[in-house]
């Protein structure tokens, strides 16, 4: 059985002042948090990132303007934050494969180009289809393979 002297009971008179102002509560909480963050009275083991932190009284953070801010100075892990490159007409399916679609201006519909194991392969399919549309459009205008019409006329005169 536990020693009843070590277990506080609810009927004991606890020294606490319920009539604190908000400012007084704020000062107490900030002081407690500063002690926890600065590890006052705790173990002496330190992590490598603790050396990069500014002291608590360093003034406002240059990024967020909060006094004593530690969130903005933590090193960012680029491997975790690494974003996937976005390609036009390419999206990732729930299965993990990459799908490519393109708008066909002549039919006024989306044309399905297929699914691919990588985003780069899907982007290549999109680029090939886009080049085909450009070639088709320029052929309608009387040019071949995207050549400028004015260039063709000047070469015929020579």
UniProtKB/Swiss-Prot annotation:
GO terms for biological process: ethylene-activated signaling pathway. It holds the Pfam family AP2. Residues 144-158 have a biased composition (Basic and acidic residues). Residues 134-158 are annotated as: Disordered. It is found in: Nucleus. PANTHER family: ETHYLENE-RESPONSIVE TRANSCRIPTION FACTOR ERF120-RELATED, SHN SHINE , DNA BINDING / TRANSCRIPTION FACTOR. This is Ethylene-responsive transcription factor ERF120.
């Amino acid at each position: 059985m536990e020693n009843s002297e070590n277990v506080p009971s609810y009927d004991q008179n606890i020294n606490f002042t319920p009539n604190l102002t908000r400012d007084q509560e704020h000062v107490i909480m900030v002081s407690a948090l500063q002690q926890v963050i600065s590890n006052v009275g705790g173990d002496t083991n330190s992590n490598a990132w603790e050396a990069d932190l500014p002291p608590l009284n360093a003034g406002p953070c240059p990024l967020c303007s909060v006094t004593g801010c530690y969130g903005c100075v933590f090193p960012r892990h680029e491997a975790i934050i690494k974003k996937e490159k976005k390609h036009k007409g390419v999206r990732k399916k729930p299965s993990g494969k990459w799908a490519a679609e393109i708008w066909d201006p002549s039919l006024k519909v989306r044309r399905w180009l297929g699914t691919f194991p990588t985003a780069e392969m899907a982007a290549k399919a999109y680029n090939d289809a886009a080049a085909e549309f450009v070639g088709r459009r320029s052929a309608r205008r009387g040019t071949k393979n995207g050549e400028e019409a004015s260039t063709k006329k000047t070469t015929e005169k020579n």
